[in-house]
């Protein structure tokens, strides 16, 4: 139970989905499981509506699912600060609000992006004293006990039984535009059994349309070629997307939010990190693969798949090698999911930390 009940979370939306996806899950969990009063300040309400369907982006102040949501712009009233302020992903706080934080003596935490890189453990919870007298703490989510953990609600179901293999293959596809979709679909159409690909609507639809030789595609469209069957879904709510991940045999995910949810689904997944200059994203990918699959006998098969997918080309031999090992991959990921679930979750660790500093 938290002694500090009044929290503000600041969210600046960068890629429309990842930042607000993480912030919305965290805000809801802090309120529901820790009985906190949460205000979520968002710079782009229209983009946020994709993740929060009942959000009215024309209203500057509103309540959705018992979370207070405020439009963050130059007109926002920042005269009062919360007891705890979460600056997500180094989004930067308004000077007027920082002054209010000094008066309130707010606890200030910068929630960083998730990473499996080894240096994260060394910098997690490090203080950074500021000239205004406040201390800014860096909080790093991660995969080990020495980090801030992963977002995981109590409502996530965990089972001791894996799904049995089926003749048909169900795949969810959520990726950035750089992904080699043409290469993937070329391999899938020649699969020995039927492959059903479910695509939540996003910026990759033109590439899918190009593969099938049509001008454009839209939500509800169903396209087939040989053994490949593609169904375009609407952009799903977080609950519906989580259910899709659990229902599929293989999930292609991207960024941060869908990546973590793929792990909790306990199914084989291929992750595409957010692209960064100087191949920083490749370093993050390699760090995750080295940590998560360290004890996996088929590590190279999985690592090869991730690297091909992220680098934008996928040789034909990759697909058959991956599918041949799909069952053993599923078994390993299922075990990893259950191991990670033994650690404290991010929200719980964050509440403890903020009440301690």
Each PLM stretch: what is its role?
Residues 8, 12, 16-17, 24-28, ...:
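A donor-sugar binding/catalytic signature common to diverse glycosyltransferases
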Residues 325, 340-357:
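C-terminal alpha-helical cap of glycosyltransferases
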Residues 2-8:
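Extreme N-terminal starter segment of soluble prokaryotic enzymes
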């Amino acid at each position: 139970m938290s002694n500090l009940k009044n929290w503000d979370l600041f969210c600046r939306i960068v890629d429309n989905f990842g930042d607000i996806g993480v912030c919305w899950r965290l805000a809801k969990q802090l309120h529901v499981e820790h009985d906190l009063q949460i205000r979520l300040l968002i710079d782009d309400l229209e983009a946020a509506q994709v993740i929060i369907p009942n959000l009215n982006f024309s209203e500057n102040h509103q309540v959705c699912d018992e979370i207070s949501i405020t439009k963050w712009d130059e007109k926002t009233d920042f005269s009062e600060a919360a007891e705890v302020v979460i600056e997500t992903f180094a989004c930067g706080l308004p000077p007027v609000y920082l002054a209010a934080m000094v008066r309130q003596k707010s606890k200030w935490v910068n929630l960083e992006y998730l990473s499996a890189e080894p240096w994260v453990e060394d910098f997690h919870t490090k203080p950074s004293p500021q000239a205004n007298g406040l201390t800014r703490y860096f909080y790093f989510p991660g995969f080990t006990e020495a980090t801030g953990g992963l977002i995981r609600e109590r409502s996530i179901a965990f089972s001791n039984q894996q799904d049995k293999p089926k003749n048909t293959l169900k795949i969810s596809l959520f990726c950035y535009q750089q992904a080699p979709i043409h290469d993937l679909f070329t391999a899938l159409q020649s699969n020995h059994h039927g492959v059903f690909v479910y695509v939540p609507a996003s910026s990759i639809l033109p590439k899918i349309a190009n593969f099938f030789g049509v001008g454009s595609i839209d939500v509800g469209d169903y396209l087939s070629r040989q053994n490949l069957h593609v169904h375009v879904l609407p952009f799903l709510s977080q609950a519906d997307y989580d259910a899709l991940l659990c229902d599929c045999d293989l999930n292609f995910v991207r960024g941060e939010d869908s990546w973590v949810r793929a792990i909790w689904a306990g199914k084989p997944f291929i992750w595409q990190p957010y692209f960064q200059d100087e191949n920083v994203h490749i370093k993050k990918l390699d760090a995750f693969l080295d940590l998560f699959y360290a004890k996996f006998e088929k590590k190279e098969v999985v690592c090869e798949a991730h690297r091909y997918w992220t680098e934008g080309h996928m040789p034909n031999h990759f697909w058959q090698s991956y599918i041949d090992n799909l069952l053993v991959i599923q078994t390993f990921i299922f075990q990893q999911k259950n191991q990670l679930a033994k650690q404290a979750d991010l929200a719980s660790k964050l509440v403890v930390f903020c009440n301690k500093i």
